[in-house]
Amino acid sequence: MSGGCSLLLAGLISACGSGQSEDVNQNTILQTYTLRYKEAARRVLASAEFHYENRFGTSLRLTGTSAITFQNQPMSYQNVFSRSSYVSEYTQVFRVDDQYIFRYRNNDGFVYEQEAQIPQRPLLLTLSSGSRIEIDRDLAIRFAADRTDSVTICLAADQRTDGTSQRWCQTAEAGRDFVIFEAEDLAELRAWDELQLEVEARRQRSIDGGRVEVQEVFEAAPILVYL
């Protein structure tokens, strides 16, 4: 059975659509878990997805005896544009040492427990709320973060006409402690007086020979900076 998008076998709609977990070999199912903390809303968001063979393969709904829980509570099923996923969301104050557990039972009766932990909040060293930035020269933003986390920093500007946002983002891969916005890119910000500075720490890992993927994200509350 191929993971390509033209597949129509074993009850699967297509490798780009949605199918049922009981219709595939359980050893071919890719498990993908995401744990995200949104600091501004104090919300924990967990999601789980299951795909045939790889992340581009058929999105699978857990059917038959298969099930998924987060923190011992069943996750809610949703299907958006033929993509099946399971979600859980609730309010909680962030605590550094908290552990979270996804528990998945496949159709062969095997149970997998996957621990996840929210990354620590990156600490900005060169900017703070109310800082002013100059757009006629390169802008280096330094931070302190766990060296296993990648950190993405965005400058976001709200459109005055329709309320949408534009973002200019730079990512520091794990081990780096700064990002640089070049003056050429910053020149596009001349139309705004204030910007939101958004910071996100992310760690990713692959487990069990690539059959399990885990993403853990801390989304810091944005701060205002001025031009």
Question: Predicted regions span which residues?
Answer:
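C-terminal motif of bacterial Sec signal peptides marking the signal peptidase cleavage site
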Residues: 12-15
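Ser/Thr/Pro- and often Gln-rich low-complexity regulatory segments
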Residues: 17-117, 184-227
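A eukaryotic nuclear recognition-module signature that targets compact all-alpha binding cores
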Residues: 114, 118-126
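Bacterial N-terminal signal peptides that target proteins for export
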Residues: 1-5
